[in-house]
């Protein structure tokens, strides 16, 4: 039994010495396809949850991290903008054609998107936004 305790301590120490803790957050590449998808999903959630008449659009991914849980958590720090397209007139699929005015409202958001690909399930578990500048 003592051997298992020593092994557990060694595993934790190796993880800490490598800068990683099992189940901890790991920096992710903002250009990664899965990170981009999580950021897009978070932006759609922001748009649907807001009281604005207009869609929100992803402008930039500033930072991203991942965490292995029962699936993967993607924590994304994103910048979004309020577009000129009304939610009642333009479906989300056509959002690419919607512009964000130069002097329009922009937001900085922190979101956690939980993905369980084998189910499949994607859920925003945290979304906090504030107006930029």
UniProtKB/Swiss-Prot annotation:
The keyword Ribonucleoprotein does not apply. One of its GO terms (cellular component) is cytoplasm. A motif (Secondary area of contact) lies at residues 67-71. The record marks 23 as: Reactive site. CDD domains: CY. GO terms for biological process: defense response to bacterium. InterPro entries: Cystatin_dom (IPR000010), Cystatin_sf (IPR046350), Prot_inh_cystat_CS (IPR018073). Expressed in hemocytes and slightly in heart. Tight-binding inhibitor for papain. It has an important role in the protection of cells, antimicrobial activity against Gram-negative bacteria, defense against invading microbes, and response to external stimuli. This is L-cystatin. The lineage of its organism: Eukaryota, Metazoa, Ecdysozoa, Arthropoda, Chelicerata.
């Amino acid at each position: 039994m003592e051997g298992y305790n020593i092994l557990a301590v060694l595993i934790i120490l190796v993880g800490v010495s490598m800068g990683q803790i099992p189940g901890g957050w790991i920096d992710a590449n903002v250009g990664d396809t899965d990170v981009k998808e999580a950021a897009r999903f978070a932006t759609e959630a922001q748009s649907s949850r807001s009281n604005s008449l207009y869609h929100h659009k992803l402008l930039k991914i500033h930072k991203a991290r991942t965490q292995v849980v029962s699936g993967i958590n993607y924590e994304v720090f994103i910048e979004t903008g309020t577009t000129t397209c009304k939610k009642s007139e333009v479906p989300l699929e056509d959002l690419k054609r919607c512009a964000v005015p130069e002097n329009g409202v922009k937001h900085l958001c922190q979101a956690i998107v939980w993905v369980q690909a084998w189910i499949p399930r994607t859920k925003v578990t945290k979304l906090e936004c504030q107006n930029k500048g």
